[in-house]
Each structure stands twice: as C-alpha cells, then as structure tokens.
Amino acid sequence: MLTAFAPAFKTPDLRKKLLFTLGIIVVYRLGTHIPIPGVDYKNVQECVDQASGNQGLFGLVNMFSGGALLQITVFALGIMPYITASIILQLLTVVIPRLEALKKEGQAGTAKITQYTRYLTVALAILQGTGLVATARSGALFSGCTVAGQIVPDQAIFTTVVMVICMTAGTCVVMWLGELITDRGIGNGMSILMFISIAATFPSALWAIKKQGELADGWIEFGTVILVGLVMVGLVVFVEQAQRRIPVQYAKRMIGRRSYGGTSTYIPLKVNQAGVIPVIFASSLLYIPALIVQFSNSTAGWATWITKNLADTAATPHIILYFFLIVFFAFFYVAISFNPEEVADNMKKYGGFIPGIRAGRPTAEYLSYVLNRITWPGSLYLGLIALVPTMALAGFGANQNFPFGGTSILIIVGVGLETVKQIESQLQQRNYEGFLR
C-alpha cells in the first residue's frame, strides 16, 4: 500500500503540495502549545492531570482544538468559531434571499459569502474567547480541581482583554492556515486542520484508558478499544460510501451538424447525505443549557434538573434527546442542502429525464420520495454512531472521552476519504494508475 503512494511524491508539483500541507500542519500543531499571557500553566497542568479524561462540557470543543482549549493556548478556540460561522451562514442562505442570490452568482458570490463567514468567525471568536476566559477566571473550567480558581491569578480587566485578543488572533491565524492549504496544498484546509485536531487527541486518550485499565496492566482494555475503533472505522467507511444512484438519460439534440446528448448518467444520493453536521448541531444545542447552569452557579430546582438530566451524558433523558435531535437535524439539513425542484428544473433545462418518470414536478416528487426513504436509515445510523461513547461509558465504564467517538470517527473518515480521492484524481490526470485499487 505504501508503494502505491510513491507516484504522489515522484510528481514535482504534487510533492510540493503535499510537503506544503505537512508544513502548515506542523505550524498549526506548534501553535496549540504557545501560551497566552495571564495564565498560570503549572495550575493548568495540575488541573488537566486531575481531570484525567473527564473534560465535561468542554470535551467537544477541546477535541476540535486538538487539546489546546484546556491548555488555554493561543489556538485554544481552534477552528470551532469557523465551523459555527460556516453552519450559520449555510442556514441563513436558505432564509435570507440576498444570501441565496449571492450563492447563485458563482465565484463572485461565493467569495462574498466567504468574506461574511470570516467576519462572523471573528465575532464568534471574541464571544467564545470571552466566555472561556470568564470560565477560567471563575474556576469552572475544571470542575473538581483544587487550584481551578488560581488558573488566572490576575483578575484585572486589562489581562482579560489581552487574553481574549490573543485567542481571537489565534483563530484568525488558524483560519488563514486553512485557506493556505486549500489554495496551495492538498484537500480542504479547514477539514484537514479538523482532522489533525481530532487525531492529535487520540494518543493521550488511548494512554489514559491503558493507565486506568485493570486487566494485564491495562493492555487488554487498550487492545479492545483499538479493535472497536477499527471496526467502527470500517462500518463508517462502508456507510459513507453507500449511495442510491438515480439513473438519468439525456435526449439527443442536433445543434448545427453536431449531435449532443444521448448519454446516460446518474444522480448519487448518499445514505448519509447530511454528513456530521446533525451531530454538531445536536451537541451544540445540548451544550447551551448546561453552560448556562455552569455560569449561573445556581442551586435552584431547574438548575439541578438540567445538571442531572441534560449535562450528564449517561443520563437517560440526555441520551434520548440527543438521539432524536440528531435524527431531526439530519432531515432538516438534507431538506435545506438538497433541493429536488432545482435539480429537476436543471435536468429539464438540459433535456435530462429519469426513465419512467415525467420531467418537471413528477421528477422533483420522485427525488424527494427517494431522499426521504434513504435519510431514515442514514439518520438512525448517525444517532447510533454518535452514542457510541455514551454506550461505552455506561456499559463498560470506559473513559468519558472515548477516543473513537461518533463525531471524531465520522469527521476523520469523511476528510480522509475526500483527501485520498483528491490525490487519486490528481495522479490520474498525470496518467498514473492511482492507489485506490
């Protein structure tokens, strides 16, 4: 398999892109260890050691920052503000006609939407940075740590402002690094950085499981988790590649003396058309009420109920609500990201039709019917995969931050497949055989 990658490094321009991407990744990983002023890192390290994998509410964000969040470094916020901004803009595109018109304007419209995404990313970085600093100052960032209140010794406003500015600047640098990879490297830059952030948390999480294990000095638990992870990766690859192909034929047209059309193709409808977005939506929504309770420090009945039933990932109400939110958002996101009427109109415009289905509205209804049928198993699969860490925690007493969680595996497999396909296509353009055999 490794020899199949040799042509990628033998091709000068492709080798240059790969090395450039690796260089940016190294810079990004170095940035996750650069400290910001105003933080006592001895106390931070002590709290991280005491947490021992129990990162509570901040586990998801910490994963997307490659472990930099709980270290409170320059890249503490990672790419989470950009992900959130991109999702918000994508949703607003459906609601606001002006944004929808920009989306249809081609490259110029896409550039404008990208600019809006950058502005929103900076605003969200300021907001999230302020929240993180306030949480660290109050001692709530590490629940149960004896020195959590001493992480930020200087409580002055100026120190807080400097910390927020450093984190916001770090987010802007991360966004810039991602765009550099997209323009001059291999793959989608933000997706690559997300992939690296998640993969960077695996070694420490796996080692924590080994240290906490009891059978054969923890090696049996360690091996079991690796085996479960490999099985999950295989399952996710299988489902992510699964698709329903709708056959499409194009009628022959004579333009001058030339004949056009008469070809057959298909519309690929993936089983998991929504990707990982529903999981991120559901996690973010369940994150909000628990965060409100943590900031309020209230002991009222409503706060106790939220802490017991929503903040606790092993609680039955949390599991049920999380599963149904994922299913709901899967249908919701598919509905806004795939427009059957638009696809049917484009097919009709260029003389395409589905055999046995009339062009126009009947085609749109047929596409909508098929999409709804395949979204059901896709949404149920997403819900079950996302609940793997919870099931591992409840059934086997596993580490709360089970490294092969649904969100992380979905992102790693999705980004990995997309990047490999891009390298494969570039190799085939240069008359190489490729390595996907």
Swiss-Prot record:
UniProt cross-references to NCBIfam families, sorted A to Z: 3a0501s007 (TIGR00967)
Membrane-spanning residues: 19-39, 69-89, 122-142, 157-177, 189-209, 219-239, 275-295, 318-338, 378-398, 400-420
Protein task: The central subunit of the protein translocation channel SecYEG. Consists of two halves formed by TMs 1-5 and 6-10. These two domains form a lateral gate at the front which open onto the bilayer between TMs 2 and 7, and are clamped together by SecE at the back. The channel is closed by both a pore ring composed of hydrophobic SecY resides and a short helix (helix 2A) on the extracellular side of the membrane which forms a plug. The plug probably moves laterally to allow the channel to open. The ring and the pore may move independently.
PROSITE patterns: SECY_1 (PS00755), SECY_2 (PS00756)
Cell compartment(s), UniProt: Cell membrane
Family per record: Belongs to the SecY/SEC61-alpha family.
HAMAP family noted in UniProt: SecY
Predominant location: membrane
Subunit structure as annotated in this protein's UniProt entry: Component of the Sec protein translocase complex. Heterotrimer consisting of SecY, SecE and SecG subunits. The heterotrimers can form oligomers, although 1 heterotrimer is thought to be able to translocate proteins. Interacts with the ribosome. Interacts with SecDF, and other proteins may be involved. Interacts with SecA.
Protein name: Protein translocase subunit SecY
Keywords, alphabetical: Cell membrane, Membrane, Protein transport, Translocation, Transmembrane, Transmembrane helix, Transport
Species whose genome carries this gene: Streptomyces lividans
